[in-house]
Amino acid sequence: MQTDNTKSNTNKTAKQEWGSFVFVICIALLIRILIMEPFTVPTGSMKATILENDYIFSTKYSYGYSNYSLSFFDFIPLFKGRIFAREPERGDIVVFRPPHDMSVRYIKRLIGLPGDKIQLIDDVIYINDKKIERTEVGTYISEEGIKYLKFKETLPNGRTYFSYKLAPIYGVIYNDRYGNTDVFYVPEGKYFFLGDNRDQSNDSRVNLGFVPFENFIAKAQFIWFSTKITWWDNDIGVINLVLKLKPWIESVRLNRIFRNLYNTDV
């Protein structure tokens, strides 16, 4: 027979467990909103620095906070501009909301700062009329068997990274549009972005345009997980998800897990 004391202790334990659960959820949400947030990359515009289905960890505090960087509040106009703002640097890989479609997130490399003059001539970036260092260092063959030329580029602040261009047998149709551009004058408060996959990126050269600082969400830091195929799909049903689990596990890219996105030794 259960006494009143036993019932009281049971209720107290249940309340404590529920309180602990709520506390953990609140801490997790605060971390996601203010400190770090994971993202999945669905496209190849940053290939081969970032591949499709790479899972990225990014730091929310790197540039301070705006409506767009505060998860769950990005469509609520809490305030204008940024608070605790920190200036981004050339070469940063940034997650942001594109001005033309606020329902999605883009990830690109920051090339141009406010006040800069940017142009690409024969695939070489010119910043304020000075071309950056660009050296061909080899080739890259994608998982689809497509060949890219691999270049090491160095920005004026010393930041180095790799960019990729379709080999000549693929790239002829892209040369005029992507490799030779108009002159871009970056307005105050806005930034110029490029994808590392230079011939296959919707970036500031074409449809994206300049990105306001307010639209920045986070700075991408490292890859924490990566797969060749996507497992979860709302349209395929439970049975097909189960059948897809084994090939999804087999598609894990072990060599990309915990890869630093700013490491040029790989």
UniProtKB/Swiss-Prot annotation:
Annotated transmembrane regions: 21-41
Keyword Hydrolase (UniProt): yes
Periplasmic compartment spans: 42-266
EC numbers for this chain: 3.4.21.89
GO cellular component terms, A-Z: plasma membrane
Database matches in InterPro entries: LexA/Signal_pep-like_sf, Pept_S26A_signal_pept_1, Pept_S26A_signal_pept_1_CS, Pept_S26A_signal_pept_1_Lys-AS, Peptidase_S26
Main location class: membrane
Keywords: Cell inner membrane, Cell membrane, Hydrolase, Membrane, Transmembrane, Transmembrane helix
Ranges of the Cytoplasmic topological domain: 1-20
Gene3D superfamilies noted in UniProt: Umud Fragment, subunit A
Location in or out of the cell: Cell inner membrane
Catalytic reactions on record: Cleavage of hydrophobic, N-terminal signal or leader sequences from secreted and periplasmic proteins
Bilayer topology term: Single-pass type II membrane protein
Enzymatic class: hydrolase
Any Pfam family: Peptidase_S26
GO biological process: signal peptide processing
Gene Ontology molecular function: any one: serine-type endopeptidase activity
Entry superkingdom: Bacteria
Active-site residues (renumbered): S45, K108
Family statement: Belongs to the peptidase S26 family.
NCBIfam families given in the database record: sigpep_I_bact
Protein name, UniProt field: Signal peptidase I
Species of the source: Rickettsia massiliae (strain Mtu5)
Gene coding for it: lepB
